[in-house]
Amino acid sequence: MECQEFIVLYTHQKMKKSKVWQDGVLKITHLGNKAILYDDKGACLESLFLKCLEVKPGDDLESERYLITVEEAKAVGSRAVEPDGSREALESGSRTLVSSSRSLGCQPSGLKRKATGFQRPYKMPKKVTITENSEPAASLGDENPGPPGPRLLPTFSSTLPLFPTVGQKDLTPVSTDNQSPITFSNRERSDTPLSLPSSYFKINTNTLGKEDKLCFPVSSETKHSDSLLASEPMRRNGLDSHCPGVSQNVRSKAQILALLKSSSTNRKDLHGEIPGHFPKIEPQGCLNIISKPEEDYAETQSIGNLRCEQQSENPTRTTSRWARYLPSQRSPPCSAADENDTEDKPEAQEDVNIFNLSELLQKKSELFETCSKKGELHSEDKPVDNTCQYWNQEDNLAPSFCKNSSVLVSCSSKENASLLSESDIQYSSKVPVNQHEKVWTREGSQGADADAALEPEYRPVSPLPEIGHKQTEVEASLSTSSRISDDIADMGSKSNADREDLKTVHKAVQPFLEVSFNLSNFETSDTDEASQEDSRLSQDSERWEKEAVLTDDSCVQKSCEDIGCREIVGKLPLLSSTDDEPKEALPADGTLLSEFCDRTCVGFNSGPHGDVKTGKALEGQCHSDTGSSLDSSLEWSEDVAGDSREDASQSIQGNAINCGGVSPSKKPRGVNRSLYSPYLLTAVTDPAPENSDLLSEARKSPAIEVSRALLECPCEHRASQQPVEFQGHQVKGSATSGVMVRGHSLQRGCTQFPDSIDYENFLTDTCVWTPGLPSTYGQTDFLQVISPEQKIPALSPAPTFSFNTRNEDTVLELSEESLKTRTLPGLKTIGFQDSKNLQRFPFLSGASAPFATLPADDGPAVLDPCSFMIDDDAREPSGSSMLNLCEESGLSFDLGLEGQGGTPGGVSLLPKSSTQSKWLKYQNPPQCNSTAPNRLASEVTEGLFAEAVSGLHFSHTSESESSVDPVRLQMIKGLLHQQQQDLVSRKQAFSLTLNQTCKTQEHETVLGSSASKNCRAKDLQEINNSDLCFPNGQKIISAYLPQRQVHIPAVFQSPAHYRQVFTASIIEHLNILLFELAQRLYKALSKVDISFYTSSKGETMRSGKNNSPSCHHNQPAKLVMVKKEGPNKGRLFYTCDKSKDNQCKFFKWLEEVTPGQLPQNTSQSTMVFNDIKSIGSYLRSQKVPVYEECQLLLRRGFDFQRKQCGKLKKLTTVNPDFYSETKSKIYLKLSRRESSSVYSKGDLWVISKTLDFELDTFIACSAFFGPSSVNEVELLPLKGYFPSNWPTNITVHALLVCNASTELTTLQNIQDYFNPAALPLMPYLLAMSQSATVSSKNISKRKFIPPAITSIKTKTELHLGATLQLARELINVHRLNKDQATALIQIAQMMASQGSDEDALEPFGHSLPITVIHGVFGAGKSYLLAVVILFLVELFEKCDSGTVGNARPWKVLVSSSTNVAVDRVLLGLLSLGFEKFIRVGSVRKIAKPVLPYSLHAGSDNESEQLKELNALLKEELTPIERVYVRKSIEQHKLGTNRVLLKQVRVVGVTCAACAFPCLNDLKFPVVVLDECSQMTEPASLLPIARFQCEKLILVGDPKQLPPTIQGSDAAHENGLEQTLFDRLCLMGHKPVLLRTQYRCHPAISAIANDLFYEGSLVNGISERERSPVLEWLPTLCFYNVTGAEQVERENSFVNVAEATFTLKLIQSLMASGVESCMIGVITLYKSQMYKICNLLSAVDVGHPDVKAVQVSTVDAFQGAEKEITILSCVRTRQVGFIDSEKRMNVALTRGRRHLLIVGSLSCLRKNRLWGRVIQHCEGREDGLQHASQCEPQLDHLLKDYLEKQAEEKQKKKEKEKSKDKSH
């Protein structure tokens, strides 16, 4: 059937007699059952379903909004109704749907802007890199014939500088991360083959905007190193500068040596600079920490991602070539590798002995320089000279990462050692079959062609053999490590090709890193799963390896930085390859960290890297701790390298350690300890003492010790880091090296020394972090060891330190001694355990410190707020927090990596989150252990750490946007964390298996609590550090909306704890709202091209002219949004930009812009905008409330007081804040204005200088209710506002987030009033003082209450006997039932127990000052409260008569969350004859009978109140209501209520109105909260804290609806939804149960009694008293309606059949004489409510009061009751949320006499709860009926009614006629 079109007339004025009709077009779809109405402009107005399939001219149709008259059929192809332009518009409009849908379909949803994820589009000095590496690039292409290289190269060449990730995406099918690495590698290749590793890193960095720079160093090792040194600082300053610097900075040997010397001398500075470069190489490693943490880190992350992608790509294409290198490097058989090892061994030893990073670097730089000079840099395979050979060897050796690691270690000394041991550990980890396989794969991926070959080779090979081989290689490389370092320098200079080979080899070696990943093998597979399967896994592993390598490089860089930039640069790539084993181990860690370790291994890498960054200090630490396990670990690690191949298979851990360590004798122990975290944990657990010995040994030998210490520390870190790696990686994300190292180090320490004191110390430094990671890895032994250790050591100090020491500077500033102590200065300041103990865990401390350093930006604040918590649960909490941190960090890092890689943030987030979830699974088990002692405190601490770390990660990940990124990271982390938690819960069995030590219950508890703890800590961190956070960047586009994770405990440890937790929970909620808006914003921006705006040069402006079509005047059309209600509301269309008089009829939907009109460089489906207004209109159409091009105005406050009262100038000095306001006020002049209802006081605004809200953004709230007459809104900054950054009259863009007045008010209330001095009730809100008061601790607290505070307490002179006597009198007078009497007696006892603060200390002398009353529905709660208030008033009058001194008068405050609830109690007082109260609130919201006793709360202006009251008089009121309003006007004119407010003893006010100024000076010792189960605890605290409450009465029903928190969902039941009522019950309060219900017919109450109250209900009403309203109407009935549910907007449902039957039921009831006010309709969905309301308003029932029928949702009906209740269930397919017990309880208990349920019998009967409801109905007579059977009876009733109505009308007419005739 063809689509038919009809010319119609339509009107929206359905009910008016004289209607205004408009022209339109009605299109009938091809199915014939649906029609779409368009106006004459072609705008789609509404769609309607047709009852008759045939539409003819003359038909009258009715839709939901319009009446439609069909005039004539429209001829096909004819113009529209109007002759000219408008017809065109109509026609185009008619085509709009099809074309727009077509275009939308083509539109790639994930399309990203060019500057995706970048703060600004950085122009990469790619050309320079290409120029330098032109030869190498060519050679690379040749050497790496694999298609990926060449293909990627061109792709990258075109988009490399800005979008390496994007290019990678296209090039590689690997996961986002993988793709990113691939892209990077391609770039490197294109830029320079050898520079691939560095370039690789660089590219990642470049992804941030430093990619070119990285490439440069990579391309020419020598040049790069020089440029690195010189340009590293530049890089810190700017990525761009670095890139050019690289190309230009070719230093001579002497220069490089000088630089190296200076670097070694100023290691910190070098690290700062070089790390920037290295971070590119090792995004996870030191780079971030040392240099700009954010930029470098971001770069490194990007690099890591690119690398990973590259690796995956390279393995396939470069396998053969790389295999050549890899076999030599990786396999001990390789002669090259062996030679290198042999040669490197002495060098390595030399380096180790020297442990002079400068010398090492010098050597390496010399080699590198030589190679560069000789132009051998470009030769991959053949070394030109010895130096070149070394380089080549290094390349070959690169597979044996140990070598490179050793070199690195020697270079970085401590740092390198850490790297080595870490890499070794990882390597050994890789040795395990699972890991090894993946490791090899990874290597293959990294190694490009060779890697690809290796990947297949390794895959076939059994993991153990591979591991052994790797270990062997590692040993060799370790032995040659020092030489390798030099070689690396040489190689770097040798040739880019060599470097590329090295890179590939490095990548291959990185699989060693993958070993670490393998440690997390299970996780690895999970992580890999996220990206791909085995090959994918291998690629991922490779990526991870690469990332690990990057990390390694950054670590190396740290140390190397001191030695020399050039060498480091060359070394980094080479290190990646040459130090392949150690590095690989590290890279594996890094790789794992980035991919798998993103969740796991990464953390591990980070730890060592962090240590490396603090190379000198760490080195010093290592030396001082020569005797400690670190050195020994290093020593035996090296030895193990030689001997541990067999051991490798036996103990992968040992192998890894061997690679990293020097002493053979201790290698077995060391291996276990340093190597494989999971295995190592096991091994370490058993040989814990040995481990400690090893550590001590390591400390004993200084030369090797330094490197060993570094290695061992990393090893230790690894051991714990392996599990920690996941965290570390995440941490890595935040603070590439430093942070990660710390966290991991601590964990490693635990791993290595589970049973040893060193282990303990490590744990202490590690805090709980270490244990958590091992658990994550699933090392049962380690976990076991760790869990006890974690519990034992004071982990909190480490976490505290980490928070304090988040700063890079802190890490750099670490002194050798501090490193020795294994604590950063910050840590020391915080005060870790004994410095000696710390020394035992220098790396752990270091790791923990760097970790802290990363979070330092956000973490320190968090730390401080949560410090008390950390102290309480120091060890356990720390562990938990570390785990959580890792978890969260990992998530963040993953996100960051993806973003950096250039892949869409969302895409990367999703896979990573899944992987992370797995890691979370592991993390949770460790948390169990650590959580055991103090879960609460630990949870808080965990959360804090996690949040801090994750925040840093996020910032790094998000490309140096630390301030916003941390928030977004935290938000994403929250999401990922939730996902992880989900995974954890799903895979609990697996995690439990991993954590054998943890009991199942403990594990589960930890999982839940740790998650919540993490979230809480995160939130605390956000609150303390950044408060509100608006995420920037597009990484969040595809992320899931976070859920609230903050866990609110039943008991609090202190007021500070209470404030922190609730502040965190509220901030978390607001941040989720901000996240959701940011997600909408970036999703909308990702679908369009705004390159004209984001481009610095505006090159696309030329094409912008073509973006918008031309109107009939040949002028660019303007973009306008549809504002009228209807289906097209919010759609954008082009129209003429002329004035109305000259406007042509041009019209075109935005989606209809033809592809030819779009710029060539954009996809056809992308809409292009060339002006900001169009972007703003588009964003608003996407439900983003943006105000573009507003003005930010700053004005000084005027001193009105001084001007008006010149003689009182002295007063200005008395209170200058009040009399002379010097602060500037901020005003936002809006560019447009909505209706006044859109704005309110407390609106949340986000202000930015850029329309993409990426840079220079702050959050503020509105100070008043709306814009002024000149569209100005006064703003109060909340977060991110710095006056120097925001000059006046600047153009800004604004987002109106939501109204947050409640949240902001509660936050302010908690901060201002919740303190012991102002809240006497506080101790009882924190914990059960009844039992706690017995402790001396509690008593001592009370002693600190100042006398001035206790003296103002109210005092009663009444004895308990007199109070109880008064209560009994009232019980008799008001006939209270037994339960009500019990409640009143308990209140009387509470009031008699005076001196609540002192006397309550007597445990059994008096009752608690809190009474909790649980009243079921209809239990007379409001009546009971009225009687209680009468009792209190009489009591007050008696006791106040004898008060003396400054005792406060007794007053009672009646409060609730709703006006109805407050008025209900006051109406009860009126019914009892009590009128001495004042109701404070809004005039329009107060019940009319209470109005005469009201006081307007909003303003002190009497005239405004009178205006409101006079306006009420003009409305439709009943006579009695008019009396109330007139009386109220009189009271207001006289001002009596304002005076009475300070005199009366009873005041009623809602919680929200408690902050109004008229209540400022009042104190209410007694507070009554009604409907408390519907109020959040922060809202409940408004009346409690503000008015210095001493006695509290809570009334509610927790079995009814909980508070609704709009905008965010909770991940558990202990968040903001947990009310004060719930928490007090959990705390131990026993509520008084009011069991007697007086509302419902016994048949109705029987349902609730059976389903929800376990048979405890008592009926206070008989069936006779609830007789039917109509004889034919059943008391309880289920009407089965056969209808179909339909999904409406906002995922709400409609059932038209049920709505129609409900309407007929209402009509029948009213026709039978039932008053409309007796009928209530409850629907479970809003859309159904609107549908029924529309039907009621549209149908003329002939009853004037039809509108009085109350139709509302369950939420709005709570507290109300009706004689007849009709319940519409709506759903027909699935029950959905309507089976919520609390929701059902409310819905079923609103009717007093009749409950009529309308629903689908077949659907609801399947549900457990609804099935039982139906059973109850079936048990009644006529309890189950079918609508089809009932309708005839109802129709008959209606017919009779209508006939009677007609007769009456006829009679009236006849009477009138007869009267007329008589006249």
From Swiss-Prot:
Alphabetically, the GO molecular function entries are: 5'-3' DNA helicase activity; ATP binding; hydrolase activity; zinc ion binding
Signal peptide positions (record): none
Give start-end positions of Polar residues composition bias. 173-185, 300-321
Q: Which organism is it from?
A: Mus musculus (Mouse)
> Which of the seven top EC classes does this enzyme belong to?
isomerase
**Highest taxon above the source species:** Eukaryota
Positions with a binding annotation for Zn(2+): 1111, 1113, 1136, 1144
What are the boundaries of the GRF-type zinc fingers?
1111-1153
- Predominant cellular place of this UniProt entry's protein: nucleus
Q: Which reaction does it catalyse?
A: ATP + H2O = ADP + phosphate + H(+); Couples ATP hydrolysis with the unwinding of duplex DNA at the replication fork by translocating in the 5'-3' direction. This creates two antiparallel DNA single strands (ssDNA). The leading ssDNA polymer is the template for DNA polymerase III holoenzyme which synthesizes a continuous strand
What's one Pfam family here? Zn_ribbon_GRF
Q: Name one GO biological process term.
A: recombinational repair
For this protein, the record's InterPro entries field holds: DNA2/NAM7-like_C (IPR041679), DNA2/NAM7_AAA_11 (IPR041677), DNA_Repair_Helicase_ZGRF1 (IPR052800), P-loop_NTPase (IPR027417), SF1_C_Upf1 (IPR047187), ZGRF1-like_N (IPR018838), Znf_GRF (IPR010666)
* Name this protein carries in UniProt: 5'-3' DNA helicase ZGRF1
Function in brief: 5'-3' DNA helicase which is recruited to sites of DNA damage and promotes repair of replication-blocking DNA lesions through stimulation of homologous recombination (HR). Promotes HR by directly stimulating RAD51-mediated strand exchange activity. Not required to load RAD51 at sites of DNA damage but promotes recombinational repair after RAD51 recruitment. Also promotes HR by positively regulating EXO1-mediated DNA end resection of DNA double-strand breaks. Required for recruitment of replication protein RPA2 to DNA damage sites.
CC annotations in GO:
nucleus
Oligomeric form and interacting partners: Interacts with DNA repair protein RAD51; the interaction promotes RAD51 strand exchange activity. Also interacts with DNA repair proteins EXO1 and BRCA1; the interactions are increased following DNA damage induction.
Annotated Basic and acidic residues bias: 81-90, 533-545
Q: What is its EC number?
A: 5.6.2.3
Task: Give the residue ranges for region: Disordered.
Answer: 78-110, 132-196, 300-349, 460-496, 524-545, 610-664
Localization, per the record, is: Nucleus
Name the keywords, alphabetized.
ATP-binding, DNA damage, DNA repair, Helicase, Hydrolase, Isomerase, Metal-binding, Nucleotide-binding, Nucleus, Phosphoprotein, Zinc, Zinc-finger
